[in-house]
Amino acid sequence: MTHMSIFLSRDNKVIVQGITGSEATVHTARMLRAGTQIVGGVNARKAGTTVTHEDKGGRLIKLPVFGSVAEAMEKTGADVSIIFVPPTFAKDAIIEAIDAEIPLLVVITEGIPVQDTAYAWAYNLEAGHKTRIIGPNCPGIISPGQSLAGITPANITGPGPIGLVSKSGTLTYQMMFELRDLGFSTAIGIGGDPVIGTTHIDAIEAFEKDPDTKLIVMIGEIGGDAEERAADFIKTNVSKPVVGYVAGFTAPEGKTMGHAGAIVSGSSGTAAAKQEALEAAGVKVGKTPSATAALAREILLSL
């Protein structure tokens, strides 16, 4: 039986920008073990070399290192790229991927200056928005049993009817663990920076259209108005049940909590305001991650 997913499936061919770096080396190995079709990498200074890894079956494979994203796409047919380059080089790496018109770009890198991200996003828009960007500062995306583009542990759970979109990486893992017996179509960590590519709304819209996703779980956090905007969208566009959690109920005003985007100003951006907006849109909101998982389980089993 083939399971559907959103944005990423077993058919995607993946390249890694910065494949020779230490973090990229570790996660390339993990992605290959998870079944991801990694077809090569990019590092202009090491173009023409190869890196050796084990595939899912434990066989040694040599992955080619290319000088550019465009060349990698041309030679391998890649349609997904993952960025593992340091923050100072991230803007150029993102621009290069946009110029090559890669359909999906996952930016793992943490600590990219917000003005660099904002510049790259404007550039993508100007270029006709041919590239979907997930991140930055995120764990990426996993369609369990199919493919992993990012750093989410692949062995937590298998395929199933839950679609998950989260601002928090660690809460993504916790939610997958709590509902591991039920499984997930796709889980996306969208990142907690003030400027991100794929939003809650983008993911929720895709889950609504995905025939194999029966229930949507969204994890937000204090700061900004993304959750309020998602609530408005859900109200008019989503027929599937949605369960939510908002991290940061105990946050003091004006203090950044873990993510640069997680900051409360006045009554806007508080967890209570977000919970209220979501509940008004028919979303069941849990008080804790575990309570949220319990709500999801209860609703899913009653469908």
Swiss-Prot record:
UniProt keyword annotations, A-Z: Ligase, Nucleotide-binding, Tricarboxylic acid cycle
PANTHER family in UniProt: SUCCINATE--COA LIGASE [ADP_GDP-FORMING] SUBUNIT ALPHA, MITOCHONDRIAL, SUCCINYL-COA LIGASE SUBUNIT ALPHA
Pfam family, one: CoA_binding
Family: Belongs to the succinate/malate CoA ligase alpha subunit family.
GO MF annotations in UniProt: nucleotide binding; succinate-CoA ligase (ADP-forming) activity; succinate-CoA ligase (GDP-forming) activity
GO cellular component, one term: cytosol
Principal EC category: ligase
Protein task: Succinyl-CoA synthetase functions in the citric acid cycle (TCA), coupling the hydrolysis of succinyl-CoA to the synthesis of either ATP or GTP and thus represents the only step of substrate-level phosphorylation in the TCA. The alpha subunit of the enzyme binds the substrates coenzyme A and phosphate, while succinate binding and nucleotide specificity is provided by the beta subunit.
Native source organism of the sequence: Mycobacterium bovis (strain ATCC BAA-935 / AF2122/97)
GO BP, sorted A to Z: tricarboxylic acid cycle
UniProt-recorded name of the protein: Succinate--CoA ligase [ADP-forming] subunit alpha
Binding-site residues for CoA, renumbered to this chain: 20-23, 46, 108-110
Domain of life: Bacteria
Catalytic reactions of this protein: succinate + ATP + CoA = succinyl-CoA + ADP + phosphate; GTP + succinate + CoA = succinyl-CoA + GDP + phosphate
